Amino acid sequence: MTTNKKIQWRADATHPKIDDHDARLHDERAHFTMLGGRIRYHNSLLSRLRSLSRNRDGGIAIMAAFCLPIVIGFAALAVEYGYGLLVRDENQRVSDLASYAGALAYSTTKSEDKMKVAALAVAKLNGVDGADVKVSLTASPKDARVQAVHVAITTTNTLVLAPVLGVSPKLEIGAQAYSSIGAAENGCIVALDKSASGVTLSGGVQANAGKCYVASNSDIVAPCGTKITAKSATYYEGASEPCQWSSNIVQADGSPAPVTRQYTSDPLAENKGVATLHDRFDIIRKASWPFAVKVGKGPDIEFGDKATPVQTAAAIEAVGCRYDSSNFNQYWMSRWDITCSGSEVNIGSLRVHGDIQVKFNVTGSKNTTYNFSGRIQNAQGTKLEFGDGTFNVAGGIIGADLTFGSGIFHVGQIVPKAEWNESKQALCSGNALYSLCSDGKLTIDGPSTFVLDAGLHTGDGAMMKLGAGTSNSYIIGKSSGDNAIGVGGGSVTALADASSGKGVFRVDGDVDGGGGGSCITFPASAQHDISGNVNLAGGAKLGAGVYAVDGYFSVHTGGANCSDTAAVSGTNVTIAISGTETPSDWECKDKAFCLTGGNAITLTAPSSGDHANLAVIGPQSSKRTAGAEITSGGRGRISGAFYFPNGAIDFGGGGQIGDAATGCLQLIGASISLSGGSQMMSECKLQTGSGKVALVQ
């Protein structure tokens, strides 16, 4: 057991004296004590370092201190650039308004100066300095063929905080807008159907449209030897197939024309006039027609042939009229002057034979009504003249030299008389029975109203003139055949205008102008309703107005007897064709419009109104695909749209079509083909489709 010794220390004392063993033990303990202290010190330091590395106290504050300048900088960017977006939106709004205002001004005045003034005024009104606005007239970004007013606005914002990040203190904010003026300049040659053949040339033909465009929604095929002259050409579904060895789709100066892939909309798809023309056929089909004329039976009056002057005189007195007895001869009379005092005269038939002249109440009242239960007829070599009045003639009128005053004429169908040894073939037309027939010269003054139950016919070499002035009216029914109007070779038929008052022109049947060397003049009328086909082989003058033909329209070989150089001509004329029927001959088979046999047609469309620039309008129903054919030397000069959206337009055999003297030809079809020496020309610049202004970008 070890005895603990108490060692006392004094400040000035030395170590106590101990033996050697104790001294060594004391030294060893002291050594280990010092060593342990060092180890504990090092372990404590490492522990504290580890603790410090794991300690998060105060980290957010430190990181915030480091990141705060960056956060403030980005916040400044967000605020100042966000404000810049607001300014940009405001600039865009102002540029839209200014562009639209400039476009309206230019559309009205065609002045770039006034365009700029209008745009800048709108910008100033909305707080944008004029120095920050640029206004120009340029091409639309949507369609290079359309003009547009371009307005660009560039303003500058000063950045306050963003420069902390080294960003420029100036922020430029831009906006721009385009407002188009009108529609694209329409193409002169347009093929609409994507699945059809497009625009196709062959056989050395040329299509000349140097001042406008050629467009196809399918192919453009122009092999070597053919030529297309245009400002540019476009195709869509198909391809452009020009000559491989030389440029044959060229501009007017001979340089290659731009050819691009672009869809072309139907320029007349929304045309109000086209829609009304299409609807007109429904009106025609639902229209009613007057009842056939019916009158009570009266006594016949016959001059010459088997009737003696005594018998004729008695018949005249029987109807309540008188004759001039001063030159009466019971054996023979070559002249009769008859007067009637009553307001109504009832007669059976009145016929004149031999070398006799008859004047029937030529100075009578216009209010006199003449009722004929039979017919009126004078033979070759005779002359028959009536005054004014109302004429109800149940059995038709046949005139060799027959004249009427003005009035109202309701005439029924000519009927052969067995007792007169008549045959159908002997009655003027030869192949059908009409109401009114001229086999020499038949003239009815005007203005007059005509209701012809069975149509009219002018025989070979004969003349018929109906009406005078502008307030005539025509309702013409169908003969015993298909025709309502028929003309023979070398004949002249003239119908005076029905363009004022209550004048109408309605035809229930075909118009057969098949007599070569003939000329028929149609009246000017707001509307010409023809419930049938128009087939012309001679000449025709088309009075101004709309011709709604519920069938087909064809012009064949024949020559003209009109004063115009063109066989068929018309000014301020629109022809609408339903295509419900088509010709059966091989040249025009299945076509709604056909021009052939070296004949020529010149048409000028109206320049104003609902039907402005509409010349020939084909079937509009997708179920009617009859197109147009110009072939065998047929020649057309047309101003306005020649429009067959659902049918092919084909040229062949030297057929030609081009502009009339005034206006522009616009050829629009499902497809368009030229072959066999044919030619198409449109040598003028078409106007834009409309003056409508639209914001396009």
Describe the function of each predicted region.
Residues 2-44, 82-93, 97-159, 237, ...:
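Short amphipathic secondary-structure patches
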Residues 45-57:
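N-terminal positive-inside, membrane-proximal cytosolic segments immediately preceding the first
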Residues 57-69:
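N-terminal signal-anchor/signal peptide hydrophobic helix marking the start
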Residues 68-85:
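C-terminal juxtamembrane segment of a hydrophobic transmembrane alpha-helix
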Residues 158-310, 317-318, 322, 326-519, ...:
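Short, ordered "entry" segments at domain starts
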Residues 323, 680-697:
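Short, low-complexity, Pro/Ser/Thr/Gly-rich segments in the mature regions of secreted, periplasmic
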Residues 438, 475, 488, 516, ...:
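Acidic, Ser/Thr/Gly/Pro-rich low-complexity segments that form flexible
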Residues 574-635, 643:
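Extended C-terminal subregions enriched in glycine
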